[in-house]
Amino acid sequence: MDKTVHNLPSLGFPLFQTSLVTGSQIDDLKRGIGISDDHCDPIAWINNAVAYGQKLVSVKAGWGELPTGFVAFDMMSRRELQGEEWVAKCSYNLHGVFVNPALRGKGHGRALRRTISDIIEANVQTIQDRGFADKVEIFFEAECITADGATFVRALVSDCEKMIEKMSERRSADDTFRIVFKNCIDYGDYDNEAGFSAPAP
């Protein structure tokens, strides 16, 4: 995925662009999120993503010059034989998500969630189309340290579950390919769903 444009008509314009961040775009991302403290968590997440080869996806509204938010995550896949069937184990570990505080509640987080869901769907579809496995197990991991982050993760898990349900509905009756979603989320102090009042990033 180089660049994805998401049109969210229910939220009105502008469109949202999400793209994988390359080394030359790191400084623009740091400026765009509105954080100047090099020791804060969002900057650390960006630096760690670069240092450890994590996926770093940015988002910006309309055709603006600077990205204004991002999500950093690891994506790993392996295949193993269990009994008489091949199982693909796909792990997604969310390390950080952040949107410029002045722009929250406008749809940036939704665009980032949709992009991650699209990436997972494309990965599963490739495994199925190429016959790599009879079954896919998706492991989604995250540790929530803020209410906004927990809200984002909860919505992302819901998006992924709906995506997997739709993929399952599209299969023919004689298709034995299976998808299993395993939620390994640590919501910490934000485990009470009724306690969420802050808008998602």
Q: Where are the language model's segments positioned?
A:
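Non-catalytic substrate-recognition and accessory regions of acyl/acetyltransferase enzymes
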Residues: 1-103, 114-139, 144-201
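A short glycine-leucine-enriched loop at secondary-structure breakpoints
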Residues: 106-111
